[in-house]
Amino acid sequence: MAMTIHVDIVSAEKSLYSGTAEMVIAPGQRGELGIYPRHTPLLTTLRPGSVRIKAPNQDEEELVYVSGGILEVQPHLITILSDSAVRGADLDEAKALEAKRAAEEAMKDKAATLDYAQAQAELAQAVAQLAAIKKLRKLP
């Protein structure tokens, strides 16, 4: 039997995933982090993107989109806290495309600095959601 690690993914609204995994890949600020059981303790921030979970005895990885957040790793436990998170199967491509279009439109008005920064953050989240949808559907 393969070694496993317990994984909890929690958003402000609810718990999205709680179970064991053989491996987790998370979107760190400086690149993707691959985490296996007995990993060295770690605390870092996450950027918007998809968390991939390889559960024992399953061929397919489970995908959870996170809008950013905090990742804590202990040798036998991974905890991800995110403002918002969505299971990959529940992502809405049309909604993500509309959010991307709206953010790009808002970024055209560079006069409002605060709105521009907000639009940049929204654009990053929309692009990350679309990338998660693409991974889920295994599109090139």
From Swiss-Prot:
Belongs to the ATPase epsilon chain family. One of its GO terms (molecular function) is ATP binding. It comes from Thiobacillus denitrificans (strain ATCC 25259 / T1). Produces ATP from ADP in the presence of a proton gradient across the membrane. This is ATP synthase epsilon chain 2. F-type ATPases have 2 components, CF(1) - the catalytic core - and CF(0) - the membrane proton channel. CF(1) has five subunits: alpha(3), beta(3), gamma(1), delta(1), epsilon(1). CF(0) has three main subunits: a, b and c. It is found in: Cell inner membrane. Its main location: membrane.
